[in-house]
Amino acid sequence: MPDTMLPACFLGLLAFSSACYFQNCPRGGKRAMSDLELRQCLPCGPGGKGRCFGPSICCADELGCFVGTAEALRCQEENYLPSPCQSGQKACGSGGRCAAFGVCCNDESCVTEPECREGFHRRARASDRSNATQLDGPAGALLLRLVQLAGAPEPFEPAQPDAY
């Protein structure tokens, strides 16, 4: 009986202890996470102009948000980094941060949020002027034509009577 008592006591102590036994625990233990400073999340999107807001969300001030697209693929790397990050200028909604003009994102989704329109006006207007010069010439003409075609109503063709 004493031979089985020692292993049983050891297993009991092991079960009731609260240490980190898994590899995914933060350095310094469970309570060390509050001591870490938040870093800025990874850059993403076209030209690295955006920031990750979740594993499949990439937002940029002048581009808006990409959710579940190729532009947001880099954001999946954030899951493998040991330190927490935070993007966005100010808190909004339920646990989100302002991501772009009028858009509030958390790590799972984005919603329109009127309080996120403040602080983006000047940047959005300045970028409108700079983006217009980037599309001068044939590329700009092609893009303009595609937008016009997409917005044009389709021609109405009367239905042909069925012939037997």
From Swiss-Prot:
What PROSITE patterns does the record tag this protein with?
NEUROHYPOPHYS_HORM
Q: Which residues carry this modification: Glycine amide?
A: G28
Q: Does the keyword Glycoprotein apply?
A: yes
A cellular component term, taken from the record's GO annotations: dendrite
What is a GO molecular function of this protein? neurohypophyseal hormone activity
Task: Tell me what happens on changing G28V.
Answer: Gain of antagonist activity on V1aR/AVPR1A (and loss of agonist activity on this receptor)
Q: Domain of life of the organism in this record?
A: Eukaryota
Q: Name one GO biological process term.
A: symbiont entry into host cell
Q: Name one Pfam family in it.
A: Hormone_4
Major place of residence = secreted
User: What cystine pairs are annotated?
Assistant: C20-C25, C41-C85, C44-C58, C52-C75, C59-C65, C92-C104, C98-C116, C105-C110
Q: Where is the signal peptide?
A: 1-19
Where in or outside the cell is it found?
Secreted
What positions does the record give for glycosylation?
N131
Mutation: A19T; reported impact is:
In NDI; probably causes insufficient processing of precursor
Keywords, A to Z?
Amidation, Cleavage on pair of basic residues, Diabetes insipidus, Disease variant, Disulfide bond, Glycoprotein, Hormone, Host-virus interaction, Secreted, Signal, Vasoactive, Vasoconstrictor
Which residues does this entry assign to the site Important for agonist activity on V1aR/AVPR1A? G28
Is the keyword Secreted in the record? yes
Entry's disease:
Diabetes insipidus, neurohypophyseal: A disease characterized by persistent thirst, polydipsia and polyuria. Affected individuals are apparently normal at birth, but characteristically develop symptoms of vasopressin deficiency during childhood.
Q: Quote the subunit structure annotation.
A: Interacts with vasopressin receptors V1bR/AVPR1B (Ki=85 pM), V1aR/AVPR1A (Ki=0.6 nM) and V2R/AVPR2 (Ki=4.9 nM). Interacts with oxytocin receptor (OXTR) (Ki=110 nM).
Identify its protein family. Answer: Belongs to the vasopressin/oxytocin family.
> What is this protein's name?
Vasopressin-neurophysin 2-copeptin
Task: Give the species this sequence originates from.
Answer: Homo sapiens (Human)
